[in-house]
Amino acid sequence: MILGVDTGNKMIKTDHFIFHSGIKVKEQRILNGEEGICYKGVNYIENSQRITYLQDKTTDDRYYILTLLGIAKELEKAEEKISGKGVIPVTLLVGLPPGDYGRQKRRFQEYFWRQGKTVHFLYKNRPYQITYTDVRVYMQAYSAYLLIANRLRLIQYSKVLIIDIGGFTVDYLMVRYGVVQPTQIDSIPEGIITLYKRINAGIRQHFNLHLDETDIDNILFKRNTQYPEKVLRRTFEMAKDYLVELLGSFLELGIDIRTTVAVFVGGGSILLTDLIEEVWVRYNSQYYIVDDPQANVKGFMKQYLAELAGSEKT
């Protein structure tokens, strides 16, 4: 099986599933049908409390286990295809932020590969065995860009700025005529979690109310909430201020957004879609939003299949 897993700081994404980047140990065994995994004798269940930000995700096994959990979900969904196969061969496609890709790619690959040894685990108290036949590491954000690049003919532009508003960081990279510019790749430590903290503090200070991240998401997505209009209005004001500051910071980095085509990707970009439209008026340039939280995963697959086709021709 070919399986892609996007290991975000806030959410884990696979082809068919999205869940929080959080796990916790459960002392009791996983029950039949319970959403949890047992690996090396330790029981883990999903937790909405995300993992503390890790610059290097290979520091410990948590992202390995979260990835295994994502794989388990996909294996269960593909039950008819894998039934009776014993050890299931898996080609794993994962990604790293643009700023970390060059220096961490090999280490991240080895983190999952582990000499291709068979991996035994229980998911929902059901046994599985997999072996990684291959592990490919791709560049996040650029992978999402590839989904729309051909359709929108972005390769014809001299400057396309990809902005990935993620959980802890905002990753960006410049693409010129379809080619990534290695000197214009970096991360800004101002991801959407920064916005959550600002809004939480501001609302608590002015209205003595506590908004958690789900509350803020619901407000910014304009879902029905029980909060007063003044709370909603203030939340949007703070989100707009955050976005204005974020986009303004690119000029300090030597990037004039007015002279680029911007492509927004990532869950934070989707959350701020309406505000991006409102703020973008001042830039008077083209922009696109990839409105798909699983875009990176699909981009991983697109690149892998292209590599496969290329190798078959040689």
Task: Label every PLM stretch briefly.
Residues D171-M174, Q184:
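Short, acidic (Asp/Glu-rich) active-site segment that either coordinates a divalent metal cofactor
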Residues I165-D171:
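Ser/Thr-glycine-rich phosphate-binding loops at phosphate-binding pockets of nucleotides
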Residues M1-V160, V179-I193, T214-D217, F221-F264, ...:
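Nucleotide/phosphate-binding catalytic cleft detector across ATP-hydrolyzing
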Residues F207-L211, D215:
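Short, basic interhelical loop/turn and adjoining N-cap
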Residues G202-H206:
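Conserved AAA+ ATPase "sensor/coupling" helix adjacent to the nucleotide-binding pocket
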